[in-house]
Amino acid sequence: ETKEFLSATKVSDDAFQYLVKYFEKQDEPTIICMFGDHHPSIETEFYETLLGKKQSDWGLEEIQKRYATPFIIWANYDIEEAKEVSISNNYLENMLLKQAGITLPLYNQYIEKVSQDIPAMNVNGYMDMNGKWHNYGDSESKTVSSLLHNYEILQYGYYSDSDKTTMKKLFQWK
């Protein structure tokens, strides 16, 4: 599985390079965001060797390392550079919109607010502003608890409220 993953990664890298070279030559301003939406399906033994311990002994920090996926935002014009950014996939849309100079829609404004206190989250937990991972429900501050609760409601509304009227009523922005 590891060899297969590395071979597929090489093919993806080559395809991305081809795409970038094409758009480098285009006059129309273009931004490309490429990311993996999940960790690779590699043998647990590989990760155990990498981390130096059995999976049953992993803490939340080590579990999160298995779910980390790289991303890149590239443009054929100058954009702000950032390296070694730790965010979750749900925040990439905002990063992309801001790089493109697009005003954040209502939904994204709340996502931006959440990201200021919770820079990363996934099915396993969330990262605080100090880069420490926490399980959901483990001694969350009232602020974090409220943000997560409202985010859950908003996310449900975003995907189920086709004309977004409920969201507009719930979240009034100035």
Describe the function of each predicted region.
Residues E1-K174:
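Solvent-exposed soluble domains appended to multi-pass membrane proteins
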